[in-house]
Design a protein with these regions (language model features):
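Short helix-capping segments at alpha-helix termini
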Residues: 1-4
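C-terminal interaction segment
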Residues: 7-74, 81-126
Length: 126
């Protein structure tokens, strides 16, 4: 993975084509892409390194079940589900192939793919 700022952050609306079909794309709330070769005029063609979804009542099933499975299959390295209703962040570290970790908003969430980065979600809700 590139060091010294080689990754870029994209926010919705931004198409992520995780299958070889432009008709089947997702628009994550936030995605971090470290491989510039995946970027095109259509969006990101392939799996971003890290995706963050903010759950809403209408997206709960999609974020926790449908997108989780799709992101895992596509090769996303890390997936965070930020859930305001539950005041927690669920972290899937697909690189480690481990069970998800659930962290309350008032505790720091350690990023798996960027070891020097941790985020306390409650700091951004004030």
């Amino acid at each position: 993975m590139p060091k010294n700022g080689g990754c870029e952050v994209y926010m919705a609306p931004f198409a992520v084509i995780i299958q070889n079909d432009i008709k089947n794309y997702v628009e994550p709330d936030i995605c971090i892409i470290c491989d510039k070769d995946k970027l095109s005029d259509r969006g990101c063609e392939g799996a971003p390194d890290w995706i963050i979804e903010i759950v809403s009542p209408s997206s709960r099933k999609t974020d926790y079940i449908i997108k989780n499975a799709a992101y895992s299959r596509a090769g996303v390295r890390e997936y965070w589900i930020v859930d305001p209703a539950k005041a927690c962040t669920t972290v899937y570290d697909y690189d480690k192939d481990a069970a998800p970790t659930i962290i309350p908003f008032d505790q720091p969430v350690q990023c798996g793919i960027f070891p020097d980065l941790s985020i306390t979600v409650s700091d951004y809700l004030k």
